[in-house]
């Protein structure tokens, strides 16, 4: 006849989950085959795990309390159960076991530690700043770690205790027949911990609101719409939880001269009709400052595009630059001096192909309507 599971663990039928777990860890440590040479250690260890397998689960425990071992006989006959204690959650069982036995290992974090929220900051910079890179100081308000209690939420020198009602998980379970209902622990309000003497500065939250100043490094070649992540610079976590992150979204202010196209820059370059006809050199401003000479070919037409290689935007983590593309806009003077008009009239008379061009133009127009 199988031994009563409560007797195996040495607990009463009204024992809490925390008491059941505590008893299990103590016995598992005592009878684990690797820690004792007792001849019946393996048998005892299997019995302990079988008992804990049922009693740690509220639904299985309710069925056991009502029907005893018969509640699991059919399941075992179908091959659906295994009371050896080695068939599931090995890491969870031995994680807690070796944590207590060896003084190390993983532990589940209580719900009192909550990660801080991420923050978003919109930063507008000039085109020249995007080209060269710059360090910007920004100011914003957020939750910061309390310097009085170091984020614990408890008054200095006071200890924070695990809630004995929920065992530190922040929720309690209510058994109703075969159903288990979970609800927020009324004693710790879901925090999993009890702060008997809350910090006066942060009122037990482990953080408080403050205006912050932060230096942001903008790399050279940053593009419009780039998002820069600053890990751990978001809001402080609650009661020692990890900080959130800060995301800085970059917007580049429209420039009076240049328009951005990836790493290339476009600009409108006005020239006189004399320069367009005769050609020559003209100085144009560049993004890094100063001016460079641009060669205008003779006969340049309005709307032509001339390229200055490697005079565009810098690229992040690269020595390669984009190009600068100048869009020619030929300006025709609206007011002419007497001498300028005479010269243009003379040029008009001496135009060799003027008549042919006119004849060609009118012939084409005539053919369109014939």
From Swiss-Prot:
* GO cellular component labels: cytoplasm
Gene designation: dnaJ
SMART domains assigned: DnaJ (SM00271)
* Co-factor binding comment: Binds 2 Zn(2+) ions per monomer.
ZnF start-end (CR-type): 133-211
- Where does this chain mainly localize? cytoplasm
UniProt GO molecular function: ATP binding; heat shock protein binding; unfolded protein binding; zinc ion binding
The entry describes its oligomerization and partners as: Homodimer.
Question: What does the record give as the function of this protein?
Answer: Participates actively in the response to hyperosmotic and heat shock by preventing the aggregation of stress-denatured proteins and by disaggregating proteins, also in an autonomous, DnaK-independent fashion. Unfolded proteins bind initially to DnaJ; upon interaction with the DnaJ-bound protein, DnaK hydrolyzes its bound ATP, resulting in the formation of a stable complex. GrpE releases ADP from DnaK; ATP binding to DnaK triggers the release of the substrate protein, thus completing the reaction cycle.
Indicate the segments forming the J domain, all copies.
4-68
- State where Zn(2+) 2 binds: 163, 166, 185, 188
Which PROSITE patterns has this protein been placed in?
Answer: DNAJ_1, DNAJ_2, ZF_CR
Which is a Pfam family this sequence falls into? DnaJ
* Family named by the database record: Belongs to the DnaJ family.
Q: What is known of its domains?
A: The J domain is necessary and sufficient to stimulate DnaK ATPase activity. Zinc center 1 plays an important role in the autonomous, DnaK-independent chaperone activity of DnaJ. Zinc center 2 is essential for interaction with DnaK and for DnaJ activity.
Q: Where in the cell is it found?
A: Cytoplasm
**Which cofactors does the annotated protein need, by name?**
Zn(2+)
User: GO biological process annotations for this chain's record?
Assistant: chaperone cofactor-dependent protein refolding; DNA replication; protein refolding; response to heat
Q: Can you say what this protein is called?
A: Chaperone protein DnaJ
- Per-repeat ranges for CXXCXGXG motif: 146-153, 163-170, 185-192, 199-206
Q: Keyword set for this entry?
A: Chaperone, Cytoplasm, DNA replication, Metal-binding, Repeat, Stress response, Zinc, Zinc-finger
